[in-house]
Amino acid sequence: MGYDFKVKLTGERERVEDLFEYEGCKVGRGTYGHVYKAKRKDGKDDRDYALKQIEGTGISMSACREIALLRELKHPNVISLQKVFLSHADRKVWLLFDYAEHDLWHIIKFHRASKANKKPLQLPRGMVKSLLYQILDGIHYLHANWVLHRDLKPANILVMGEGPERGRVKIADMGFARLSNSPLKPLADLDPVVVTFWYRAPELLLGARHYTKAIDIWAIGCIFAELLTSEPIFHCRQEDIKTSNPYHHDQLDRIFNVMGFPADKDWEDIKKMPEHSTLMKDFRRNTYTNCSLIKYMEKHKVKPDSKAFHLLQKLLTMDPIRRITSEQAMQDPYFLEEPLPTSDVFAGCQIPYPKREFLTEEEPEDKADKKNQQQQQGNNHTNGAGHTGNPDNSHAQGPPLKKVRVVPPTATSSGLIMTSDYQRSNPHAAYQNPGPSTSLPQSSMGYSSTSQQPPQYSHQTHRY
């Protein structure tokens, strides 16, 4: 390569510092690098972006796989990778994503903390339904293209703030995503342990090697239950989180304490699970005779004859073969009764959740949140938006007012071109137009905790 050509190439290469203003707008940091809230310097648009600087120099093969996959995924409910920058001078890699102001981890935490008040703020029924429908829509797109997400949890479900996509769900963190149409090896051989413990399907905990899209459906069921109750349904103490052994006694015990021990007729293939002998040695069926999902949800005031409960049962079916698919779930009667799902999960109402705050260069990570993050997942992952977030370990903490973060980035995914255009499979549950937004304007660059506090929800109208 000639010198003149190198000079010309360097001059033509886009530099992230020339295109975006992000100094002093750091919203996250971790072992993966740093994340900034950014705006274009040329003013071509007024959008907010998430700009992630990957730690270290150059780009790893795992990051290449993730980027290759992200560049092929195009769906309204999947986070969008806008651009990749490579700084020639210091060999730093920058990823540009859509910026999401909120995520389910902090939304649920906000409502959970309100339970200490005399008038707790429950997630409105319409908002829960819209969130679930959009999650299913995004996952159906991934599954239709043979992509398993493999790490669904509230921290990886982003929600857009004020702007053109207000209230739209974005599934993020494709770090563990894998193509499943024709793997050369069992997926369990590629990654022995996937999915954060609380959202891990029972077949994974029992060592399944050829797991399927059903693992994502189980995780969605866990998220749905958490939206309905503001509590993680299968919360348990985290131990030995770095082990490569998928079997986890405490997590299985928590599942059985909620669901009951699976009957042979309800999960015939459980005997084929690699860890079945360990399961039968460690557990006694009669210990969980009085445990059932009905009893658990009734404690949280979810009626067993409601359509919401019936759908939850289908999502949390123990046998992965009998577990409902994303397409079937989108066609469930739950989505056909009022209130219908909307494209803006806030349904045009004022958003009550605090915005993210900026971090100073010297500001340490919040110790409590950092401890929770380490307990929940042992290491950091990459989410699509490049934000940092906390798994839902500390389910008794108050609402996030300081150092709010969404999920950290890693990269361990396979990337191949998607094979088919995606069509919405459920015309009967199309989003409803919520009408003009009645929310108050918010600063486009604000991360302060001075966002207006919400009025009490009206439990009749389910509005803020």
UniProtKB/Swiss-Prot annotation:
SUPFAM superfamilies: Protein kinase-like (PK-like). Residues 373-390, 447-464 have a biased composition (Low complexity). Keywords: Activator, ATP-binding, Kinase, Nucleotide-binding, Nucleus, Repressor, Serine/threonine-protein kinase, Transcription, Transcription regulation, Transferase. Its main location: nucleus. InterPro entries: CDK, Kinase-like_dom_sf, Prot_kinase_dom, Protein_kinase_ATP_BS, Ser/Thr_kinase_AS. CDD domains: STKc_CDK8. Residues 360-464 are annotated as: Disordered. Residues 1-15 are annotated as: Interaction with CCNC. GO terms for cellular component: nucleus. This is Cyclin-dependent kinase 8. It comes from Danio rerio (Zebrafish).
